[in-house]
């Protein structure tokens, strides 16, 4: 059997720190970010299905979200101000991401390509799946800002404002529900969110 470096590369997601140009109270890596995005994307899809007549496969969306930044094991996490400095850089970075996604898929054993390619290659996702994962990605970045700000780190003040605009652009009924039901707790302390717990 031929050796594959696929999972050895994926395991390096935990070594890639997000928000590299900003001072962080707590550093966040791509691996933990991907898990949070997967949980939030799954919730958004489930909310859409349960409350707003959606027909999404919430489990598939959780998987897509788990892999949404996987290509960063080859490209690193380019800071947002650099990535979107102008339209040409944004376009070139998208092309680099596409190459990295394909290179990552090519590392998987041939007999598993058809399993991993549709998870890693965003072109294989439906528009609705892409939208949900993008909403979850922006929501998780916003939640990171709330956590940093609540810890007294004003470095994330402008990032929060920018992300509020992004969330407004990606707004949906399921996102409004998530924001109303789940996000307020992120402004509270551990004691405050544990008050009603019988433990």
From Swiss-Prot:
Catalysed reaction equations from the record: a 2'-deoxyribonucleoside 5'-phosphate + H2O = a 2'-deoxyribonucleoside + phosphate
Tell me the GO molecular function terms: 5'-deoxynucleotidase activity; metal ion binding; nucleotide binding
Gene of this entry: yfbR
Q: Which Gene3D superfamilies match?
A: Hypothetical protein af1432 (1.10.3210.10)
Site residues by UniProt (Appears to be important in orienting the phosphate for catalysis): 18
Sorted keywords for this record are: Cytoplasm, Hydrolase, Metal-binding, Nucleotide-binding
GO cellular component entries: cytoplasm
Q: Which Pfam families match?
A: YfbR-like (PF12917)
Q: What organism does the record attribute this protein to?
A: Salmonella typhi
User: Does the record's keyword annotation contain Cell membrane?
Assistant: no
Purpose of the protein: Catalyzes the strictly specific dephosphorylation of 2'-deoxyribonucleoside 5'-monophosphates.
Protein name per Swiss-Prot or TrEMBL: 5'-deoxynucleotidase YfbR
> Is Nucleotide-binding among this UniProt entry's keywords?
yes
Assembly and interaction partners: Homodimer.
Binding-site residues for a divalent metal cation, renumbered to this chain? 33, 68-69, 137
